[in-house]
Amino acid sequence: MDFKQHIKEVADYPKEGISFKDITSLMQNGEVYKKSVDELVAYARERGAELIAGPEARGFVVGCPAAYALELGFVPVRKEGKLPRETVRVSYGLEYGTDILTMHKDSIQPGQQVVILDDLLATGGTIEATIKMIEQLGGVVAGIGFLIELDGLGGRERLEGYDVFSLIRYED
């Protein structure tokens, strides 16, 4: 299926010069949304996933249904202050400053095979922070899957050494 035809591009959003790739148009079509999640499920299964992790908020949009389909647990990766129990945390760089991501300390067991799912790979900063926490807890990153990858922003290069899968790729 050509998933790209179901992504709407919004010019100059969220700021001038940006061509925003809007996944909500894909999600509004139940058949297409299901097929996109099914592709990520197949990828996670191939990679031997024992657990799915996804960064907020759009990682939940693909990660939760994939975990459900695979009958696996889902680990939410959240911004600081959003999880109620003891967490691990990683600071990561943004275009203008830094942010902190967290996950529960008891969410991953040593040696557990974790597949990370998210909506979009751009620079890879959020996923790199997610990887650090998974590995800090002793988990193994078995693969990383995305609906969309924006080539030319260094994300794939930043994740070198990990298996990366994308349903849709946009060149520069």
From Swiss-Prot:
Pathway: Purine metabolism; AMP biosynthesis via salvage pathway; AMP from adenine: step 1/1
Catalytic reaction list: AMP + diphosphate = 5-phospho-alpha-D-ribose 1-diphosphate + adenine
One record GO biological process: adenine salvage
InterPro entries, per the entry: Ade_phspho_trans, PRibTrfase_dom, PRTase-like, UPRTase/APRTase
Top-level division of the source organism's lineage: Bacteria
Top-level class of the enzyme under EC nomenclature: transferase
Classification via Pfam families: Pribosyltran
UniProt keyword list: Cytoplasm, Glycosyltransferase, Purine salvage, Transferase
GO cellular component assignments: cytoplasm
Enzyme Commission code(s) on record: 2.4.2.7
SUPFAM superfamilies tied to this protein: PRTase-like
Record flagged with keyword Nucleus: no
Record carries keyword Flavoprotein: no
Task of the protein: Catalyzes a salvage reaction resulting in the formation of AMP, that is energically less costly than de novo synthesis.
Subunit structure: Homodimer.
Family: Belongs to the purine/pyrimidine phosphoribosyltransferase family.
Name of the featured protein: Adenine phosphoribosyltransferase
